[in-house]
Amino acid sequence: MKVRALVVDDSGFFRRRIKSMLEEHPGIEVVGEAANGRQAVEQAQKLRPDVITMDIEMPEMDGITAVREIMRRQPTPVLMFSSLTYDGARETLDALDAGASDFIPKRFADISGDMEQVKRQLQERVLALGGGRGAPAGRAPRPAAPVDRGARSERARPAPGEASGRAPVPPTGARARPEAPVAPTGAPAAPAPERGQRIRPGALRLVVIGTSTGGPVALQRVMSRLPAGFPLPVLIIQHMPASFTPAFAERLNELCRIEVREAKNGDELRPGQALLAPGGRQAGVEERGGKLTVRIFDASSDQFYKPSVDIAFASAAKYCPGKALGVVLTGMGADGCEGAKLLKRTGAPIWSQDEATSVIYGMPAAVAKAGVTDRVLPLDQVGEELAKLR
């Protein structure tokens, strides 16, 4: 059965190009088009597509408002097209908070030309998101006001989706099928959360979290549960363009009780602080003078993921053998699997998100299938269990 897609853009040229690229894949059928957000909401209810591609800036109703309405009326996985600017990044993060599942950069030159890589990326995202035939993961709304830097304490602070006056967001959402390289349906049953390996107090020096599709919302839910006095440093690897990571680090910092910022080369990894790897480059850890620091370096041409979870995990295995917790959250592909194997050989624990709460069960499925996962946890429990570490 083909994945049924609805294409939404106020530009007729872009609608035609996106439709053409999608329908070159035998597994995708474009069942409708819309020129603005209002039409998108109507078409989503009428056509009930498996996935929607959505522009942000449109007349009558913008893409963010349309996503919000679609999630209220006819929850459907939505792939946003985003400009590669700081403002575009913040708008895209707002769309993800509203319920969109993922985003893809919107470059006129790429879409107007016959860019094979862009076409393949678009097709893969639509197939992955549309394959679940259901609703996307719960949104993680922004707080009413930024966290006061001087008030980061053990005071109670609601996690995203649990803010005052809002009902908690259900942790489960539409699970989309992973792309071809990963076959989680054949994966052996992973250990139940309550039977997984427990971590002794003082046994760790570092937490490394890796994620891709669905990661921005997942990270907001996980990181917002960590207390201000969290005893470990956190390195976050999120597949994201370079222009997006500064805005995303700011968003996390607004939500969290610990400090979150974009990593710079040579930054010390300190307890109670999370560093987000910059997009478009590689990030790892190294030890200088007995202190763990971040190493930021250019990616080689053969490295597809920039930043790469595998590279970060491998560096943690080298400099924190047996003392780095690797966490793999929702995402396409298998990035993190090989690095998790290296971590595991040093005696380090590995956690992964479960299938039911993953937007794309690719990366977590890969580590589960490889047999290196110690604990398989629902998304909200990942943050809860991290908060218990001492």
From Swiss-Prot:
Annotated keywords: Chemotaxis, Cytoplasm, Hydrolase, Phosphoprotein
**SMART domains reported in the protein's UniProt record:** REC
Q: What is its main location?
A: cytoplasm
Domain Response regulatory stretches:
4-121
The record's listing under Pfam families reads: CheB_methylest, Response_reg
Q: Which reaction does it catalyse?
A: [protein]-L-glutamate 5-O-methyl ester + H2O = L-glutamyl-[protein] + methanol + H(+); L-glutaminyl-[protein] + H2O = L-glutamyl-[protein] + NH4(+)
Q: How is it modified after translation?
A: Phosphorylated by CheA. Phosphorylation of the N-terminal regulatory domain activates the methylesterase activity.
- E.C. designation(s): 3.1.1.61, 3.5.1.44
Q: Cite the active-site annotation.
A: 212, 239, 335
The UniProt regions of compositional bias labelled Low complexity, in chain numbering, are 136-148, 179-193
Does this entry carry the keyword Nucleotide-binding?
no
Which compartment or compartments is the protein found in? Cytoplasm
Look up the domain of life of the source. Answer: Bacteria
> Which SUPFAM superfamilies does the protein's record reference?
CheY-like, Methylesterase CheB, C-terminal domain
List the residue ranges of the region (Disordered): 130-198
How does the entry describe the domains? Contains a C-terminal catalytic domain, and an N-terminal region which modulates catalytic activity.
What's its job? Involved in chemotaxis. Part of a chemotaxis signal transduction system that modulates chemotaxis in response to various stimuli. Catalyzes the demethylation of specific methylglutamate residues introduced into the chemoreceptors (methyl-accepting chemotaxis proteins or MCP) by CheR. Also mediates the irreversible deamidation of specific glutamine residues to glutamic acid.
What is the protein name for this chain?
Protein-glutamate methylesterase/protein-glutamine glutaminase
The protein's organism comes out as Alkalilimnicola ehrlichii (strain ATCC BAA-1101 / DSM 17681 / MLHE-1)
Read off the lineage from the record. Bacteria, Pseudomonadati, Pseudomonadota, Gammaproteobacteria, Chromatiales
